[in-house]
Amino acid sequence: MTDPIADYLTRLRNAIKAKHKIVEIPASNLKKEITKILCNKGYIWDYRFIEDKHQGKIKIAMKYSNINKVNAIKVLKRISKPGLRKYTSYRKMSRVLNGLGIAILSTSKGVMTDKEARDLKIGGEVLCYIY
C-alpha cells in the first residue's frame, strides 16, 4: 500500500456511505493519532485499539444523528499525497470551511489540528481536511 492515510480515509468514507456503525481499520501510529483527533472533535463516537499478531486494528464507532441517520463527517479530503507533499506555515494556514471543519497536520510536535498548530505557531504537512 503506497498511501495508508488515503486508505484510512477511504475506509471511513465507505463505512459512512454504507451506514456502518463500526469499521475496523489496520492500525499504525499515525492512524491512531488521527483517530484520537476525530474522537476529540466529535466526528466519531468512540474507538478502540485491538492488538493482534501483526500490526493491530483500530475499531471505530461511527457517529450518526438519531433523526435522519446523517453522519457527523460530510467530507474527508486527502491533501498531501506521497507524490505531491503539501506543507504550510502557521501564518499561511487557511481555515477549513471558515472554521467549521478541521485540517489535520503532521508537525514536529506530533499530529494535531490546524487550530492547535496556529496556537503553537508551528507549521507542517497538511494531511487532510475533515468537515
Swiss-Prot record:
Keywords: Ribonucleoprotein, Ribosomal protein, RNA-binding, rRNA-binding. Transmembrane segments: none annotated. GO terms for molecular function: rRNA binding; structural constituent of ribosome. InterPro entries: Ribosomal_uS8, Ribosomal_uS8_CS, Ribosomal_uS8_sf. GO terms for biological process: translation. Pfam families: Ribosomal_S8 (PF00410). One of its GO terms (cellular component) is ribonucleoprotein complex. Part of the 30S ribosomal subunit. Contacts proteins S5 and S12. One of the primary rRNA binding proteins, it binds directly to 16S rRNA central domain where it helps coordinate assembly of the platform of the 30S subunit. Belongs to the universal ribosomal protein uS8 family. NCBIfam families: PRK00136.1. HAMAP family: Ribosomal_uS8_B. This is Small ribosomal subunit protein uS8. The lineage of its organism: Bacteria, Pseudomonadati, Bacteroidota, Bacteroidia, Bacteroidales.
